[in-house]
């Protein structure tokens, strides 16, 4: 039986941790002048994905 392919788009966006997956937050690449320093600082951190999305990510990334 052939190997399952990983979803390349998901592989670029999600990293596995001990408790699930983490991802970078959005709204950080452009139009930053109207956003406060506090908002931009909080957006720099990585977030855990929701438990409801975990099964979908695991299915897209079988070997990661």
UniProtKB/Swiss-Prot annotation:
Keywords: Ribonucleoprotein, Ribosomal protein. Residues 1-48 are annotated as: Disordered. One of its GO terms (molecular function) is structural constituent of ribosome. It comes from the Bacteria. Gene3D superfamilies: 4.10.410.60. One of its GO terms (cellular component) is cytosolic large ribosomal subunit. Residues 1-44 have a biased composition (Basic residues). GO terms for biological process: translation. Belongs to the bacterial ribosomal protein bL35 family. NCBIfam families: rpmI_bact. This is Large ribosomal subunit protein bL35. The lineage of its organism: Bacteria, Pseudomonadati, Pseudomonadota, Gammaproteobacteria, Oceanospirillales. The gene is rpmI.
